[in-house]
A protein has these predicted regions:
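Bacterial N-terminal signal peptides that target proteins for export
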Residues: 2-12
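Bacterial N-terminal signal peptides
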Residues: 11-20
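Sec/Tat signal peptide C-region and signal peptidase I cleavage site
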Residues: 20-27
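Short N-proximal segments of mature Sec-exported proteins
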Residues: 33-96
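Compact alpha-helical subdomains of small soluble proteins
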Residues: 70-142
Length: 142
């Protein structure tokens, strides 16, 4: 009889534990969704992701590090006005799923401009075009 009650208690504890973890996971996903849905944060992180890919791919295109740092800090400040702490913003940026999502968006950005995966020269040309146009991406590069 006691063994039966122990089994029931363990099953209840497991159910509550799984429910709590699932709720925490959904809460985290919802938190990230608020950052993803904010146009300033989303477009800013796309600018950084594309600029970073250009910088990493092109010897003749350099990052304007202080400008990029200031731009990134403006995104953190904006997220803080939305109620997020710096630690939460850092957790969002460090999240591997989010990093991959922004890499995928950057790849799509290049594909829309006719750059195929592995086409370093194409990436560099897009970078030079962005610099010439004075776009948000171009302002982070030289």
């Amino acid at each position: 009889m006691i063994k039966h009650y122990t089994t029931i208690l363990l099953a209840c504890a497991l159910t509550v534990g799984v429910g709590l973890l699932t709720s925490m996971s959904f809460a985290q996903t919802d938190r990230w969704q608020a950052l993803r849905d904010d146009p300033t944060i989303n477009s800013g992180l796309i600018v950084i992701a594309v600029g970073r890919q250009i910088h990493n791919s092109c010897d003749d295109v350099n990052a304007r590090l202080l400008r990029a740092l200031g731009f990134a800090e403006s995104l953190v400040s904006h997220a803080q006005t939305l109620g997020f702490s710096r630690a939460q913003v850092n957790a969002f940026i460090d999240d591997r799923t989010e990093q991959q999502r922004y890499r995928d968006i950057a790849s799509q950005y290049f594909a829309e401009r006719g750059v195929q995966p592995g086409d370093g020269a194409g990436v560099c040309q897009v970078g030079r075009d962005e610099i010439s146009a004075g776009s948000a991406i171009g302002r982070l590069l030289r």
